Amino acid sequence: HDCREGICGMCSLYINGHPHGPATGATTCQIYMRRFNDGDTITVEPWRSAGFPVIKDLMVDRTAYDKIMQAGGYVSVRTGAPQDANAILIPKPIADEAMDAASCIGCGACVAACKNGSAMLFVSAKVSQLNLLPQGKPEALRRAKAMLSKMDELGFGNCTNTRACEAECPKNVSIS
């Protein structure tokens, strides 16, 4: 099951050799058959990565992302009541950058596209999303170290800056 809106990442598949298929900026659930010509051969495969082992057929285990998030993808410092957190002023450029990082849906296309199976784009997006905001600053260093350590522990590869992750990301998350 998936959201059919490109916001949950559960539909993650390789279609004709590309994570999420041939369209740019779209997830698998947003790819329609009308994109293909009559008689085309369509190859559908599960993600290919040691970090996402195949469970059965096209289903992969993506709980590694959950484990990375559990290692530090949250803010635990007290910011007051919910309305108090909303009163913290954040400059627009920083808020925009944090929102861009928050657009990562954790689908795994970056890992599937990377020849090393690196989850660095996912981890950096989640770390940036939280570390840019005032509420996340007190735990910024600990968060980054914990999430990177968990990524390494789970067997994801290292980044070699080929930018394949960025090219295949359906939400256009940038490595910079």
Language model feature labels by segment:
Residues 8-64:
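A generic, well-ordered mixed alpha/beta core segment in the N-terminal half of proteins
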Residues 42-176:
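Ferredoxin-type iron-sulfur electron-transfer modules in oxidoreductases and energy-metabolism complexes
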